[in-house]
């Protein structure tokens, strides 16, 4: 009978933990030194049976089975060692379950003990000059993936001899010098994964050795974060670029690094950081990749930690003028897009609630400040304007008959458009030439992304549309001069959406007073607050509301029936406020 096809193909693998449990069970149950082993009992029975002349053949067979089981342990330990090493490597990238290592070939050695002995012996021979540099590098290359060989060999060599090997690694093949470095990198990475520790008394990994290897193999995440922490110091700049590249390729390590250094990073990566002991210009691009991995996460990374990193940096840049590099501002744009649903909730929910772990729950003013920092980069500006246009369209189209959706769409486009306009005004106040360059890049990028020009992206609506396009030479300037009527030095902070939220809640209260079944609040109570009412008799949120009641209230405020009922009252008040702010009546 054939094996049913479970979709797994011909893959055979090992779960290292389960194999370890099996090894311990076999050792304890069939050996003479195991706790609760049956072997001593069987031997005792055989002795007694022999004394009284009973047949002991069956007991002898049991003992043979016990001996056979004990004889399998070295082989099983070898398989478990190979599997555990690969599992640890893959675990840093979020992969779990069975692995292929150890399921088939045992490598060049039948047991872990044999591999370890060979690793130590070969290293000693090299140290004693009994084998040449090239021959030893060939041995390392042949056994670079063997954790038992690597652990014993690296331990015997020590940090300083390994550093010498790094400098001489091209001797493996002078025509292909990178082969030796790659083999040594795998050798050291597997040794460290198997437990070799090179840290000094202060807990620092050796930068001079490992910075030259980390981009040639997969090193443990904690090793990368240790090296990266050291690279924040000005004296270690020479090692940092290779470390930044390796860190960016490991989302788990990058997320932890950003988390551990979140308070210092804005200073480290500020715009003039090269002159203040921080990030140097040639390495900005590679560090930007670290920052993106640390805020967005990826395989193996903790999404809660990544969101927490983002929350802290969004909050920081919403209240500081400590501008960063354009590359970081582009990362911020990517982050805004990645957390787009969180941005939308913050900007448009009539009653924002905590979005929970793995999300960025910040006030709309925080996102506005973060968007403002990102838009210092004109390419990022164009991408964010295109993103906001697409998001607004999707929100509006999702519920075309619901005024709440249309209001949300306007809030999204208005927020991003306002921040872009504010950035333009600030740049123009300092240097009109820079502003023209910024605008030109935005226009070019938008033309590529949207297939149209910046005049449409910044079109404030009917007022601008009354002006002939032929007369529009500087749409942004036209917008700020004829529509907003606020000079750069008077502009201040962006208008908070809290005011419209007050209007929305007040209009909902007025409508609810007329109809207590408006929007069927009970259905939202059933979904979000275990049936507990969330409204007072006059349509306000109950005091000391639970998170579930707050969520129910937020969703009820967006109900189509509620939005349609309050639409007129809300619009009259909201548009009146907007007119007084902008001068458009």
Where do the language-model regions lie?
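N-terminal secretion-targeting helices of virulence/extracellular proteins
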Residues: 1-106, 110, 114
């Amino acid at each position: 009978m054939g094996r049913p096809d479970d979709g797994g193909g011909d893959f055979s693998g090992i779960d290292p933990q389960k194999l370890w449990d099996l090894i311990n069970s076999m050792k304890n149950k069939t050996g003479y030194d195991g706790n609760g082993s049956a072997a001593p009992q069987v031997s005792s029975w055989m002795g007694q049976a022999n004394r009284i002349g009973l047949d002991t053949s069956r007991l002898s067979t049991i003992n043979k089975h016990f001996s056979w089981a004990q004889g399998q342990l070295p082989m099983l330990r070898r398989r478990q060692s190979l599997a555990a090493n690969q599992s640890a490597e893959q675990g840093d990238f979020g992969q779990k379950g069975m692995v292929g290592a150890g399921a088939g070939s045992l490598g060049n050695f039948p047991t872990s003990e044999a591999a370890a002995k060979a690793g130590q012996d070969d290293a000693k021979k090299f140290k004693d000059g009994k084998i040449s540099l090239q021959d030893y590098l060939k041995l390392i290359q042949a056994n670079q993936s063997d954790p038992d060989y690597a652990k014993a060999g690296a331990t015997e060599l020590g940090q300083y001899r390994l550093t010498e090997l790094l400098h001489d690694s091209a001797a493996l093949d002078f025509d292909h010098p990178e082969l030796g470095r790659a083999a040594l990198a795998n050798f050291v990475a597997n040794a460290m994964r198997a437990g070799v520790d090179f840290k000094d008394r202060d807990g620092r990994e050796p930068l001079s050795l490992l910075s030259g290897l980390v981009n040639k193999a997969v090193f443990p995440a904690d090793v990368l974060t240790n090296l990266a922490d050291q690279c924040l110091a000005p004296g270690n700049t020479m090692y940092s670029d290779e470390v930044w590249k390796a860190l960016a390729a490991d989302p788990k390590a990058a997320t932890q690094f950003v988390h551990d250094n979140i308070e210092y990073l804005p200073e480290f990566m500020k715009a003039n950081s090269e002159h203040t002991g921080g990030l140097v210009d040639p390495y900005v691009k590679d560090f930007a990749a670290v920052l993106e991995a640390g805020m967005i996460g990826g395989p193996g990374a903790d999404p809660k930690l990544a969101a927490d990193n983002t929350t802290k940096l969004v909050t920081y840049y919403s209240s500081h003028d400590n501008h960063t590099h354009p590359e970081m501002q582009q990362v911020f744009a990517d982050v805004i897009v990645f957390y787009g649903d969180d941005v939308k909730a913050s900007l448009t929910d009539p009653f924002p609630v905590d979005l929970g772990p793995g999300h960025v729950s910040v006030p709309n003013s925080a996102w506005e400040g973060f968007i403002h920092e990102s838009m210092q980069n004109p390419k990022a500006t164009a991408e964010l304007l295109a993103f906001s246009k697409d998001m607004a369209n999707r929100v509006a189209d999702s519920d075309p008959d619901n005024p709440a959706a249309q209001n949300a769409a306007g809030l999204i486009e208005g927020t991003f458009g306002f921040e872009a306009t504010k950035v333009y005004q600030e740049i123009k106040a300092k240097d009109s030439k820079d502003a023209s360059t910024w605008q030109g890049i935005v226009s070019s990028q938008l033309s590529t992304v949207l297939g149209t020009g910046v005049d449409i992206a910044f079109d404030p609506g009917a007022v601008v549309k009354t002006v002939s396009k032929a007369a529009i030479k500087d749409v942004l300037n036209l917008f700020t001069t004829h529509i907003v009527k606020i000079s750069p030095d008077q502009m201040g902070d962006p208008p908070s959406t809290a005011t419209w939220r007050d209007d929305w809640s007040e209009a909902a209260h007025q409508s609810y007073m007329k109809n207590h079944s408006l929007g069927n609040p009970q259905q939202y109570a059933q979904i979000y607050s275990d049936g507990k009412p969330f409204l007072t008799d006059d349509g306000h949120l109950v005091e000391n509301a639970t998170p579930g009641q707050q969520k129910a209230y937020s969703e009820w405020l967006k109900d189509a029936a509620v939005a349609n009922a309050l639409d007129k009252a809300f619009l009259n008040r909201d548009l009146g406020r907007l007119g007084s702010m902008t001068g458009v009546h």
